[in-house]
């Protein structure tokens, strides 16, 4: 047929590897509007999002602000691990605390505590409303609540809270559904609604701010408790078991095992041990570019795969090590294998430069894409803006760059514990009742973990990703640079998604399930483009022009 070629023919009858720009999709029949396109997808076996975008766990891309922004837009962020465990845990908790259903671990104080304690909580964590119980802990008898209105004009910060708290309270009584509690909160016109049991003991809290966020961000990715989804990266080092345990207890919805070459005994053993300790914890393995690599990780029990090796804009693995694969070819073959062996979701990681690349990655079988360079330079990315040759930019670097390896700090074995009433302690959700048995499962070192003991605990997450922690000479597999200011992800992600929706409409696929069905059935057609065809398909023959991403 002259109307293009199916993917099977393109990828299995040539010795060449293809990138996204080498391919173009053939149009289909349009019988629906662009607003009818649904991009809901899975990023692991059990984790669903409404936008197929995940931010990369890089130290110049994803910390809590980026993770919050991505989740509000319907995707998810993955907190990088080029930092101490305690700090990474705190980053995860900031995402989880940004939006809540029932707040099950609120900061709580006693009547004898002072106004200064409330100020410390507000300064450190941003919360200005604090329930007051007789014990200063969740589960104590509720006596009142202190809000910013109660203490705004007080000059004596040593004033006991018993003198300023509001004791005439509107409360919800357990058991209560979240919808009922939210309606009660609306009717009360209060900022917070404490939830109590029959003994008037505090069991939870809900916030009016969350009702506003629900209205403003209807696509937001949330867990069963209506908190934003967030992932966190861990390395394959043996002691990162403790990091993984701390992140799981902090509420991370998925752990991403961060390695440039995922088919290693270290990653296989780590995945098996994590699955033994936390059977319900979702784990994304990688990175992989071949079916053989994918098989190793799927057999180990991963719930999702990252695809890509050397295709990122700041990655030099293919040049330095001569190992990797063209990204479009890697995505097609790995996704095909994963689909046929357990239907494991795949994330295309690397090489994404525009919304068209996102569309092509999804069309080749990916369930979502992971973005680094496209999100770097946004307001939510870590780092400060500066001017380079008159252009406002932010630093962006590969995790294999020497700068990233040097930037890592010494890891701590575990984060500090947090008492529910202590304003100075790090916030965390309570550990589950099965914690002791899980900890013992984690502490049993596997043979390969013992053989890896020489991988010292002082190395950085970045160095561990490239197996370079204990090397006298570190070979960079990435570079450091800068990217232009892109504004906020609150505008960038909707622009990208709208472009993808138009692409879906053009080929006649309402959902990603429809798109993948067309791919498997051969109805989805592609052409391979020559260099001249690629130039023709972009802006050309103009004296000058201005390329704007969105209006």
From Swiss-Prot:
Compartments it resides in: Cytoplasm
Segments of skewed composition (Low complexity): 422-462
GO biological processes: GMP biosynthetic process; GTP biosynthetic process
Catalytic center residues: 315, 465
Catalytic activity: IMP + NAD(+) + H2O = XMP + NADH + H(+)
Assigned EC number: 1.1.1.205
Complexes and interactors: Homotetramer.
Family statement drawn from the similarity comment of this UniProt entry: Belongs to the IMPDH/GMPR family.
This protein's name: Inosine-5'-monophosphate dehydrogenase
Source organism of this protein record: Toxoplasma gondii
